[in-house]
Amino acid sequence: MERGEGRRGDCSVQVRKKRTRRKSDGPDSIAETIKWWKEQNQKLQEENSSRKAPAKGSKKGCMAGKGGPENSNCAYRGVRQRTWGKWVAEIREPNRGRRLWLGSFPTALEAAHAYDEAARAMYGPTARVNFADNSTDANSGCTSAPSLMMSNGPATIPSDEKDELESPPFIVANGPAVLYQPDKKDVLERVVPEVQDVKTEGSNGLKRVCQERKNMEVCESEGIVLHKEVNISYDYFNVHEVVEMIIVELSADQKTEVHEEYQEGDDGFSLFSY
């Protein structure tokens, strides 16, 4: 009986202790722990010794299907989302220490800044942080699920933009870059004078061709007249009569006689032609 009672007493004593988290205030609070690590780092810097850089750690976060809806889209170090939407931050203490709970926050950005503050206090200049000292980018490591759906989904174009895209192309004018849409009236005013110029040029060319053709006809007619004038007919002359006239003239020259008469008391000559 005594042994049984002793065993029952041992079982009642071996009760599982509940794990308690550090409070934000108090002697063993989160703030006191961070302060203590900050003092340790200052001592190391004064001794010209440096602490080993922390490990990169895993960026997996929660297991697949665990955590909040936006947990898989967040890449902040030491930050994860609960199933009910709250964001929490944790950091592991140096020298393979235990994880330090930094608290829960309404946004992932606040949780990331809390992690950076604790990391600089624990690891000093070798700390791996989410933001640099001069960086204030709030969307560098976390993107909400709706925004990702909008970026990955099909792009929707408003009706006004569709009308603009379906409108005729714009014409770029010379000079400064000014885009304008041509009007039908302007196009007609610019095209009609060109058509008229073409018509006038065509009519002038036709007139010039006709005039040249007329000149050629006149020249041909004048040439025909001249040719007719040159080709004179000899029907108006009698060849036999002309020959007889030539013979008569030759015979008259042969019948010319010169008589020299010498008379007493006259020293000259006298010529008589018959």
From Swiss-Prot:
One of its GO terms (biological process) is positive regulation of DNA-templated transcription. Transmembrane segments: none annotated. Residues 1-75 are annotated as: Disordered. Induction: By high-salt and drought stresses. SMART domains: AP2 (SM00380). Residues 1-10, 35-50 have a biased composition (Basic and acidic residues). GO terms for molecular function: DNA-binding transcription factor activity; transcription cis-regulatory region binding. GO terms for cellular component: nucleus. Pfam families: AP2. Transcriptional activator that binds specifically to the DNA sequence 5'-[AG]CCGAC-3' of the cis-acting dehydration-responsive element (DRE). Binding to the C-repeat/DRE element mediates high salinity- and dehydration-inducible transcription. The keyword Cell membrane does not apply. This is Dehydration-responsive element-binding protein 2A. Belongs to the AP2/ERF transcription factor family. ERF subfamily. Residues 75-132 bind DNA. It is found in: Nucleus. The keyword Transcription applies. Keywords: Activator, DNA-binding, Nucleus, Stress response, Transcription, Transcription regulation.
